[in-house]
Design a protein with these regions (language model features):
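Metal-cofactor-binding active-site regions of metalloenzymes
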Residues: 28-517
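Secretory targeting and sorting signals
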Residues: 2-27
Length: 517
């Protein structure tokens, strides 16, 4: 959707001073299947593991592929939300910190006060994010999810400006691809669902929703909304001009989210709308289910929602499915609710990717489930900080290492980096420190994030069992000037083009790191 400009390697060279003090690695080192440069950089990484500043600098400049699990309203910084609230003349209650339209009465203060009054600003930031949060009467889970209701009024009027901040941040982190979640035509879908009602006969319900162009009207509305958001985005970023900001280089796709805690009629309507969008507009790549998985309505209707997806999936083969599943932990729900969500999301809900998957070890016959995930190449989107803040699951209690040991593909993601007050480098740093990842591990995590992205076209790689290039692109070093056959492949296949670009970024990164020695 957006891929207008490629970033340079100037920032890589700028970090050389932090990386320079190490002695050079042995020049001839080479990893199996890798380049000599790769082996030398791997040794370099091993030498800076205990140096926080140099490790952070190294990981910040590392090409990190894509972010596959990202909620736009939770990804934008709290500071930008405050700024937007002030510009839009909103109010913020000084006791509940809920944003609302004016006039500001009683305990409500103008949002502008959070710009000029530092004490109030700090209170708002703490209420709208996880900054300085310490569990007490309120759990991390409850505080995290409550933030969305507090800043909600400030988070929907300027999606283009919000996306601009997110993609600029990603470009600074050397990421090139984003899938972010939005609720398309939210009000219209809710109204249509209320008018139509629910029917366990999904085929009949679908026909009623499609009748008289009702869903198509919402499709057209959602596409128009995205057109306007992207116009705002491109205006903010100056894309296509000499002043283009770095975020213009990030390719963006949208996941249409459905609210799993809503009434069944609304969930079905939202899923159907998302499927139709993915079939008509390549910018809308997939559908997902959001809201806490542990809410009672989510638990009560879990099987029903998976059956909805089972019905819709064969009707919309171009619509990808990624599902939040297993964002649970013992004590949050009763034991029975930990036993099947991931398995059912894959086998019934046709999920190609799973977001979170934290409770996998609690599922029935978890060893068989892990084999199934590995055999089917179902990717797990892993937001380590989010899982710690919401579920208090981290370190060796987290299944990240278990998934990797079991051959299940994984990719690091941010989830809601604005709420969490983190970025993707923080997640890579956390993973390296906790799980002793090698340089090859890091490259493969980044490669996997692009390989499993829902961006169109063929892959650069022969298959998902390793990173061996397809025949058309084997005659030149990856990421350099391609042969005519390879160039044709890259021209016609956006996924392969992103992957080739990343291989070039790896080469630039490795050369810059070693020049800084």
């Amino acid at each position: 959707m957006i891929s207008l400009r490629r970033t340079t390697t100037a920032a890589l060279v700028a970090c050389a001073a932090l990386l320079a003090p190490l002695a050079p690695a042995q020049a001839g080192t080479q990893l199996p299947g890798g380049r000599p440069l790769e082996g030398r950089v791997a040794a370099f990484l091993d030498g800076i593991r205990q140096d926080p500043a140099r490790l952070d600098a190294f990981l910040r400049q590392l090409p990190k592929g894509g972010d596959l699990h990202n909620h736009l309203s939770g990804a934008v910084s709290t500071e930008l939300l405050i700024q937007l609230a002030a510009e839009d003349g909103l109010c913020i209650d000084s006791e509940t910190f809920v944003s609302a339209t004016g006039p500001c009465q009683g305990t409500a203060r103008p949002a502008q006060d959070a710009v000029t009054d530092q004490d109030f600003r700090t209170q708002v930031i703490r209420s709208w994010s996880m900054q300085d949060f310490a569990p007490g009467q309120e759990s991390g889970h409850d505080h995290f999810f409550a933030t969305f209701g507090k800043f909600g009024e400030a988070s929907w009027r300027h999606p283009g400006r919000m996306l601009a901040e997110v993609t600029d941040t990603m470009a600074a982190q050397h990421q090139s691809y984003l899938e972010t979640m939005l609720t398309p035509a939210s009000g219209g879908a809710a109204a249509l669902a209320a008018k139509t009602g629910f029917d366990q006969d999904f085929a009949a319900l679908r026909q009623r929703l499609l009748a008289d162009g009702q869903i198509q009207t919402l499709v057209d509305q959602a596409r128009g909304d995205l057109d306007r958001a992207m116009a705002e985005y491109q205006d903010t970023e100056h894309c296509g001009t000499a002043q283009a900001r770095p975020g213009c280089a990030v390719t963006v796709r949208i996941q249409s989210q459905a609210s799993r805690a809503a009434a069944p009629a609304r969930v079905f309507t939202q899923l159907l709308l998302g499927m139709e969008l993915a079939s008509q507009d390549q910018r809308f790549a997939a559908v997902n289910l959001v809201q806490p998985e542990d809410y009672q309505a989510s638990l009560d209707n879990y099987d029903l929602q998976m059956r909805m997806l089972d019905f819709l999936h064969p009707l919309y083969p171009n619509a990808h499915i990624s599902l939040h599943a297993g964002e649970l932990a013992p004590g949050l729900v009763k034991p029975e609710d930990l036993r099947f969500h991931i398995r059912q999301a894959v086998l019934t809900g046709h999920a190609e990717r799973i977001g979170h998957g934290v409770d996998v070890a609690n599922e029935d016959d978890s060893a068989d489930l892990l084999r199934t995930l590995a055999e089917r190449k179902v990717l797990i989107e892993v937001p380590l900080t989010s899982n710690d803040q919401i579920l208090q699951v981290s370190g060796q209690d987290h299944p990240f290492a278990l998934y990797r040991k079991s051959g299940v593909p994984t990719a690091l993601s941010t989830d809601d980096p604005g709420v969490e007050r983190i970025d993707i480098t923080h997640e890579y740093l956390r993973a390296v420190r906790t799980y002793q990842l090698t340089y090859r591990d890091l490259k493969d995590l980044a490669r996997t994030s692009l390989e499993y992205g829902f961006v169109g076209g063929r892959s650069l790689w022969q298959d998902r069992n390793g990173y061996r290039p397809v025949a058309e692109c084997q005659d030149r070093p990856l990421g350099t000037k391609p042969t005519s056959a390879c160039a044709a492949l890259l021209r016609d296949n956006p996924k392969a083009a992103l992957e080739w670009q990343q291989e070039g970024a790896f080469r630039d990164f490795e050369q810059a790191v070693l020049r800084g020695k």
